[in-house]
């Protein structure tokens, strides 16, 4: 696989993630766009690791996946608490983070 193709796909995924974060107001959609951006970075790590024949990129992918799993657990817990407290997951309506 050509490195430019992988770079283009990764760049497109990352761009779609940024656009989704800037346009959408649903907290779950924003969360999924952040995960899309992390997967774009993982694709880039794998592409460069395959291109250069170095396994370091694959190790970084493993660490990014571990961090993404922890982020998913914390992020979904926050979204569930947002819905339980005010019955909305719209980030515009839920802008005050008070105890």
Curated annotation (Swiss-Prot):
- A Pfam short name: Oxidored_q2
GO cellular component terms given for this protein: NADH dehydrogenase complex; plasma membrane
* Catalyzed chemical reaction(s): a quinone + NADH + 5 H(+)(in) = a quinol + NAD(+) + 4 H(+)(out)
Which keywords has UniProt assigned to this entry? Cell inner membrane, Cell membrane, Membrane, NAD, Quinone, Translocase, Transmembrane, Transmembrane helix, Transport, Ubiquinone
Location in the cell reads: Cell inner membrane
Q: Which Gene3D superfamilies match?
A: 1.10.287.3510
Quick one: where is this thing mainly located?
membrane
Q: Which cysteines are joined by disulfide bonds?
A: none
Its GO biological process annotations read: ATP synthesis coupled electron transport
Q: Which InterPro entries match?
A: NADH_UbQ_OxRdtase_chain4L/K (IPR001133), NUOK/Mnh_C1-like (IPR039428)
Q: Which residues cross the membrane?
A: 3-23, 28-48, 59-79
Q: Which domain of life is it from?
A: Bacteria
Query: How is it placed in the membrane, per its record?
Result: Multi-pass membrane protein
The record's note on quaternary structure and interaction partners says: NDH-1 is composed of 14 different subunits. Subunits NuoA, H, J, K, L, M, N constitute the membrane sector of the complex.
Family classification: Belongs to the complex I subunit 4L family.
User: What PANTHER family is this protein classified in?
Assistant: NADH DEHYDROGENASE SUBUNIT 4L-RELATED, NADH-UBIQUINONE OXIDOREDUCTASE SUBUNIT ND4L
Q: What does this protein do?
A: NDH-1 shuttles electrons from NADH, via FMN and iron-sulfur (Fe-S) centers, to quinones in the respiratory chain. The immediate electron acceptor for the enzyme in this species is believed to be ubiquinone. Couples the redox reaction to proton translocation (for every two electrons transferred, four hydrogen ions are translocated across the cytoplasmic membrane), and thus conserves the redox energy in a proton gradient.
Q: What is this protein called?
A: NADH-quinone oxidoreductase subunit K
The gene name reads nuoK
């Amino acid at each position: 696989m050509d490195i430019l193709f992988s770079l283009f796909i990764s760049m497109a995924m990352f761009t779609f993630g940024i656009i989704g974060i800037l346009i959408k107001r649903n907290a779950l959609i924003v969360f999924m766009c952040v995960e899309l951006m992390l997967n774009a970075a993982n694709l880039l790590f794998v592409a460069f690791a395959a291109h250069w024949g170095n396994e370091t990129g694959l190790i970084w992918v493993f660490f990014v996946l571990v961090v993404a799993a922890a982020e998913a657990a914390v992020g979904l817990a926050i979204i569930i608490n947002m819905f339980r407290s005010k019955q909305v997951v719209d980030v515009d309506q839920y802008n005050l983070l008070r105890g």
